[in-house]
């Protein structure tokens, strides 16, 4: 049987890690005593593989272009170390799933031990900048949800078929995402008790289209939120919003225009 050594996989690929617990977005969940292990892949088709099948309205404004990567992309539109690393990880997923899974499982176990030693809840978000069905994360005929049935997984998604996974796996939680054009699907899911994320340009209202809104900016632990509500998120400026160094207001239905009054 072939042995897969995590350190060698990373060395061969030229990366320091596959995922982690220290991104600014995930660290916010510390406030709810949750340690989250998350994986950031190269979004939509940057890597040559499309990992975001429903991203036509949001790909230009993806959080991939925020934070430290925003600085790198503003210096060089072709990307720097962060984007290159995410591309390598994405290619590994599609081109050598076995290696990817061995490394993923190793890092999940490491992060779980860290959470346990700190007395924290543990959660896993594999689609921080992607929207891949978790049944595709497979090793030895078992997907990641089956390999870790005792652990809490969660994601945001714009893919309606992914919602079907909630009927099969009790350890998976999803928040559906409004893209400006899929309200009929969002309404149906809200009425069934699912949460829906809406990105607002300015302040977070208390109500949107007749549904209560909670402020979801404070943490990423959506699986702890109640169902049937709108999770309001404030838009974060990304590298693609800047032309010749000047900010250009995004023109997309993905971002809900709002004032400081209820919608």
Regions found by a protein language model. Name each.
Residues 1-263:
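Class I S-adenosyl-L-methionine
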